[in-house]
Amino acid sequence: MAGRKGTAKVDFLKEIEKEAQQKWEAEKVFEVSASRLEKQKQSSKGKYFVTFPYPYMNGRLHLGHTFSLSKCEFAVGYQRLKGKSCLFPFGLHCTGMPIKACADKLKREIELYGCPPDFPEEEEEEEESSAKPGDIVVRDKAKGKKSKAAAKAGSSKYQWDIMKSLGLSDDDIVKFSEAEHWLDYFPPLAVQDLKTIGLKVDWRRSFITTDVNPYYDSFVRWQFLTLRERNKIKFGKRYTIYSPKDGQPCMDHDRQTGEGVGPQEYTLVKLKVLEPYPSKLSGLKGKNIFLVAATLRPETMFGQTNCWVRPDMKYIGFETANGDIFICTQRAARNMSYQGFTKHNGVVPVVKELMGEEILGASLSAPLTCYKVVYVLPMLTIKEDKGTGVVTSVPSDSPDDLAALRDLKKKQALRTKFGIRDDMVLPFEPVPVLEIPGIGNLPAVTVCDELKIQSQNDREKLAEAKEKLYLRGFYDGVMLVDGFKGQKIQHVKKTIQKNMIDAGDALIYMEPEKQVMSRSADECVVALCDQWYLDYGDENWKKQTFQCLKNMETFCEESRKNFEASLDWLQEHACSRTYGLGTRLPWDEQWLIESLSDSTIYMAFYTVAHLLQGGDLNGQAESPLGIRPQQMTKDVWDYVFFKDAPFPKTQIPKEKLDQLKQEFEFWYPVDLRASGKDLIPNHLSYYIYNHVAMWPEQSDKWPVSVRANGHLLLNSEKMSKSTGNFLTLSQAVDKFSADGMRLALADAGDTVEDANFVEAMADAGILRLYTWVEWVKEMLASCSSLRSGPADSFNDRVFASEMNAGIIKTDQNYEKMMFKEALKTGFFEFQAAKDKYRELATEGMHRELVFRFIEVQTILLTPFCPHLCEHIWTLLGKPDSIMHASWPVAGPVDESLIRSSQYLMEVAHDLRLRLKNYMMPAKGKKTDKQPAQRPSHCTIYVAKNYPVWQHITLTTLRSHFEANNGKLPDNKVIASELGSLPELKKYMKKVMPFVAMIKENMEKKGPRVLDLELEFDEQAVLMENIVYLTNSLELEHIEVKFASEAEDKVREECCPGKPLNVFRTEPGVPVSLVNPQPSSGHFSTKIDIRQGDSCESIIRRLMKTDRGIKDLSKVKLMRFDDPLLGPRRVPVLGREHSEKTLISENAVFHVDLVSKKVHLTENGLRTDIGDTMVYLVH
């Protein structure tokens, strides 16, 4: 904090936050129990149970976690105010591989490098050596050994350095080599950090997962026994993303990169190498050798013309389980070795290493094609990290294949370079396989010709061609080949694949859709694993899950679509693993339940955790009900969570189990679960699936709503430890205070798009909050001087209506969980309404309205900034905590009155702009440019009716609007009709711009812009606020007249809601005003005296030049008894009144503009005042 200037405001907020948190803890405000609520009859307005996916305990919580959980926190804050009994529990997740992997890594580092470890120096050259051939390496001069050490905090490969960056000592770090220490260290820190932001959590219900917590362990075992009993869990070989290094499946949470990536299925087409073999393969004579190509389009294999390899790519030949030799890349062979292709799992028996160029020209037999022999040809764009490195060529349907084949046909030099004979290329033409309506039976040829693709180097055009063809081909394409003629591709694809596999021409091959790296830095493969899996593909289960989703609130259509897509493709999910932390499978204890599977219905455990664990995170303390973990058998859990389950055989007294049951029945289902959108395809979908499986007949226990949010950017950039653009929760609270941070989180964003936490906005928010508290204190101090009596002035009524409208809008925004909008309507716009009232209420603000505003504002802001609001609630002398307050009741809203006030503000803004333009120098020669004299008077003209041409236009538009169900026709139709009306002939240049303006206003304000009269009295609104308008424009006088009294030009331009004005400067005679008071800060000045001036108008004019005068009642004007000689005499100190007469408030000034003389009339007497007067300020 030392680096930041001026922390007084943040320190003030932190101080009141501590006080509020101590108060809530002492009063146990957030601790709720079903039995107590039901006894007190506090559940009449319903309950609200909200949960957040428990964060993983391998580090401190950061701002991203906080943003997601703030959605729960704000929702609970709002629902409390609406009178609901609210429960927000918070657990901490320790299941899975990362903690164990980090602990083991630390252990290895200590074994290898000592304690504390002495790591080998890393030279820059090492960094560069990882660059790929052909990459340009830019040397960063700033990077040497020293900067590496500094950078270790964010991106070190050593676990020791990562722990060091958390501020831990060497002695502390050693303890983390035991996984259990992580469970003791990080969970209490998480609770501590969360408490500093004033989370409305019942901390008695918090727990950590894994078998360290015997109650939770028992709960998860019960869940899995139930799922197995209901046939949801099965055993067998499944295709799974797998880490060979870890020796087990690699689930989403265990991945360094590739979260959400699943296995991609290919058809592995076997292209038999014909004898004579290329010289490189001659040693394998007598063996069946196949080039194996991975394709997503088995239905196009009828059109193969050749096979592609990349000349400069490394390939291997390896022996399969049946003795055949497959040629592909090492990477693909590694995947195949885990899918039963080789004799021994994970072992690739390499029999030959070769470069692609060494098999160019080899002759092949390809299945299904009409060509008996095809050849191996060069393609330079094959990627090593996708497929097998061998690509089968179908130029009729693949733009890439066609472009490469045409290159070879056109370029003799290219064929010569790679030793390709003409007969290997020239006779081969694209073969029609399928027809796409509108494109033809050689789709790739048609599209490549249309886009004028010249060669395989036209990458962008080729990408465009593929995009055009592939989806159209799959959905609209029709087969042309015998046996499948006329059938749609999407219907025959699987059949053709099966036929090829049955004929021994192909196999199923899987690899990850994209690269997946495990947290142990191992590139994952797809493996066929023996494992226990949840059968999410089960048709009935899926159907019921879709039913749950149908009734579930997702708050936005995009989230719903993401859920639908996820539920659609979810099949089997491996729920067991052999490494990490967690609960053992109850019927097969060699397996652990993985972290995405023990976290699907734990919300039910929250309902009873406080009665079992007694507030201890690890579940090691004595249970408040005296229940031991081993007593929680499957039958006991059944009784607690299943309504119709019989009472079990147990030593636990029935009333105690009934207490657990009561808690569950009261709080379930979960009313809201909020989370990042990246959890929709996994955790949140499993959450729905498992609730449906556990309570299949009780849809009233299924999730009610799920709110997904985007990721959080920090200052418009991705949060990243390595770049330093990162804030932990504790750092954010330290920097901005809890409420300052919460305000910025509410303002960061509402949708599933990425939100943005802007530090400058957080700082501005702190200032707003501080200013708000100071203003409340100011109002409390000046309470007695505020206006009382009826609150019925124009601005009183507007302010009351705007408050009521603000309450209603903010209520709607909170209800829809649109928190950025709720902050806008319930704080920013609410404060703006108060500021406007303060500015417009020239007669002073009304006490009742000011204090209603303070109360309402405090409540509306409470979900976002509870500490500050608690402080203000106390300042207001309220006996209870604001946590027991109720949502304010909105009174009537006079929309017409609010619009009349908006009209007033628009007129004031318009007048200021026109005054500015009036004061601009007249256009002309540069030497002539003199600013205009400031006007003193203004006449505002308002129209009762529209000019005739506008009246006719509006009437016409209104008739179209009513005839076309609230829509206006195109401008062409309108112009044609209006142009035919004789009354509008001479106005046609103005008519269509007027129509365009009306259409634009209609989008903003609705159909009322077609009305011929305003809903309020324009003149009355302006007259009631004439003092405000006069003061804000610094004019002497404003009069309001009807346009009918003005000249023709004004009458034609002026229309309802759009007044016109005329500025003018009333002539006057300059008079000196002298202040004889010594050291007063007031000086002599010259002002114009105008016909009919009073003392008050002259003093107001004086106040514009002498800004030191704040109160006109403190100023007195005097005239010299001798107007000619008086001003010439030297003033005598202490005799300011000598030879002068006080001018009474009733005096009227008169001017003779010809002789430039001023006199005043007072009580019927006329007196000359000369060219000088005196003013005294008391």
Swiss-Prot record:
Q: How is its activity regulated?
A: 5-fluoro-1,3-dihydro-1-hydroxy-1,2-benzoxaborole inhibits LARS1 by forming a covalent adduct with the 3' adenosine of tRNA(Leu) at the editing site, thus locking the enzyme in an inactive conformation.
Q: What is its EC number?
A: 6.1.1.4
* Tree of life domain: Eukaryota
The PTM Phosphoserine maps to S169, S722
Which parts of the sequence bind L-leucine? Y54, Y56, L596, S599
Quick one: which residues bind ATP?
K721
EC category: ligase
The record lists its disulfide bonds as none
Q: Which family, according to UniProt?
A: Belongs to the class-I aminoacyl-tRNA synthetase family.
Q: Where in the cell is it found?
A: Cytoplasm
Where do we find the motif 'HIGH' region here?
A: 62-65
Residues that the record marks as modified (N6-acetyllysine) are: K972, K1049
Report the function annotation for this chain.
Answer: Aminoacyl-tRNA synthetase that catalyzes the specific attachment of leucine to its cognate tRNA (tRNA(Leu)). It performs tRNA aminoacylation in a two-step reaction: Leu is initially activated by ATP to form a leucyl-adenylate (Leu-AMP) intermediate; then the leucyl moiety is transferred to the acceptor 3' end of the tRNA to yield leucyl-tRNA. To improve the fidelity of catalytic reactions, it is also able to hydrolyze misactivated aminoacyl-adenylate intermediates (pre-transfer editing) and mischarged aminoacyl-tRNAs (post-transfer editing).
This protein's GO cellular component annotations are:
aminoacyl-tRNA synthetase multienzyme complex; cytosol; endoplasmic reticulum; lysosome; nuclear body
Protein name, please? Answer: Leucine--tRNA ligase, cytoplasmic
User: Could you tell me the Gene Ontology terms of the biological process aspect for this record?
Assistant: cellular response to L-leucine; cellular response to leucine starvation; glutaminyl-tRNA aminoacylation; leucyl-tRNA aminoacylation; positive regulation of TORC1 signaling; regulation of cell size
Write down the InterPro entries for this protein, in alphabetical order. Answer: aa-tRNA-synth_I_CS (IPR001412), aa-tRNA-synth_Ia (IPR002300), LARS1_ULD (IPR054509), Leu-tRNA-synth_Ia_arc/euk (IPR004493), M/V/L/I-tRNA-synth_anticd-bd (IPR013155), RBD_LARS1 (IPR055416), Rossmann-like_a/b/a_fold (IPR014729), tRNAsynth_Ia_anticodon-bd (IPR009080)
Q: Which GO terms describe its molecular function?
A: aminoacyl-tRNA deacylase activity; ATP binding; glutamine-tRNA ligase activity; GTPase activator activity; leucine-tRNA ligase activity
